[in-house]
Amino acid sequence: MIYVDNRQEKMEVSDEFTNHLEKVIEFALKEEDVNIPSEISLLFVDNEEIREINNETRNIDRATDVLSFPMLDYPEKKVFKEVYTENDFSEADFDGDDLVLGDIVLSLERALEQSKEYNHSYEREASYLVVHSVLHLLGYDHMEEDDKVKMRKREEEILTALDIRR
């Protein structure tokens, strides 16, 4: 289950755009071996709101493109498909029958800015940011160079499989 909450008014959000991002999320989960019903919240915000959230949660007082708030714990350098192969969850990890993976907070305003900066489509940039965030929800990180390489490789593999290119 993907819950979408549009909390901004600067960018128009069509059903087609929302449906596309939901499909991207579902595909990324499948590619990462999430084989049980799960729940992700996808929040659309503007630069000001993501700046506030970034400041409150990370003490970084600037806008960013996407924030990820995973609900599951992962050992260092481990991801979902390495840790939860036996679907070994506690009851607290669920909302009804759905495993709660976490929240994605996406600045659509920043996604548009970056699409122009990187000279590709707005849809491609939003798709990339959503895949990036899903991977964070599943334990991927990019603080260390080896982790960054691993995460970037998975992002590109997933986007390429979806035929989403620069």
UniProtKB/Swiss-Prot annotation:
A Pfam family this chain is assigned to: YbeY
Keyword presence, DNA damage: no
Note describing how the cofactor binds: Binds 1 zinc ion.
GO molecular function annotation: metalloendopeptidase activity; RNA endonuclease activity; zinc ion binding
Enzyme Commission number(s) from the entry: 3.1.-.-
InterPro entries: MetalPrtase_cat_dom_sf_prd, YbeY, YbeY_CS
Keyword Nuclease: yes
Binding site for Zn(2+): 132, 136, 142
Highest taxon listed in the record's lineage: Bacteria
Cofactors, names only: Zn(2+)
Keywords: Cytoplasm, Endonuclease, Hydrolase, Metal-binding, Nuclease, Ribosome biogenesis, rRNA processing, Zinc
UniProt xrefs under PROSITE patterns: UPF0054
Function: Single strand-specific metallo-endoribonuclease involved in late-stage 70S ribosome quality control and in maturation of the 3' terminus of the 16S rRNA.
Family to which the UniProt record says this protein belongs: Belongs to the endoribonuclease YbeY family.
Protein known as: Endoribonuclease YbeY
Lineage: Bacteria, Bacillati, Bacillota, Clostridia, Eubacteriales
